[in-house]
């Protein structure tokens, strides 16, 4: 129902689940219990370790159904798919050139 009764005592951020609050608290404590066995880099969340480990293995489990290009992160696939649908919702206020991703616009804007 939108209730968020679990409140972080450090920053006041509210959560609807106690486990999410516990995970959030690691930001304040600096706790990083998940360690990469390859390089020793540490992470707050297991999911972040799993994604990081792909840099060592080269695994790219997310494949574009349009062109077959593969990505290590789902978010990178989603960004890539904009190339195929042609959507360009970010426009440069200086010259009007349009881009599919905010990051591309930011990079372009530096030339002005």
Swiss-Prot record:
Positions of the zinc fingers (C2H2-type)? 6-28, 34-56, 62-84, 90-112
In its keyword annotation, does this UniProt entry include Repeat? Answer: yes
One Pfam assignment = zf-C2H2
Q: What is this protein called?
A: Gastrula zinc finger protein XlCGF9.1
Task: Tell me which species this is from.
Answer: Xenopus laevis (African clawed frog)
Question: What family classification does the UniProt entry report for this protein?
Answer: Belongs to the krueppel C2H2-type zinc-finger protein family.
Q: What does this protein do?
A: May be involved in transcriptional regulation.
Q: Which PROSITE patterns match?
A: ZINC_FINGER_C2H2_1, ZINC_FINGER_C2H2_2
Q: An example Gene Ontology cellular component term from the record? A: nucleus
Which subcellular locations apply to this protein?
Answer: Nucleus
Q: Name one GO molecular function term.
A: DNA-binding transcription factor activity, RNA polymerase II-specific
Q: Source organism's superkingdom? A: Eukaryota
Q: Which UniProt keywords apply?
A: DNA-binding, Metal-binding, Nucleus, Repeat, Transcription, Transcription regulation, Zinc, Zinc-finger
């Amino acid at each position: 129902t939108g209730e968020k009764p679990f409140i972080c005592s450090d920053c006041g951020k509210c959560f609807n689940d106690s486990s999410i609050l516990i995970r959030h608290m690691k930001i304040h404590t600096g706790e990083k219990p998940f360690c990469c066995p390859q390089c020793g880099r540490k992470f707050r969340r297991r999911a972040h370790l799993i994604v990081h480990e792909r840099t060592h293995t080269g695994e790219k489990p997310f494949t574009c159904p349009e062109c077959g290009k593969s990505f290590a992160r789902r978010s990178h696939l989603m960004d890539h798919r904009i190339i195929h649908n042609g959507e360009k919702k970010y426009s440069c206020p200086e010259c009007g050139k349009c881009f599919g991703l905010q990051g591309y616009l930011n990079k372009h804007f530096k030339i002005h």
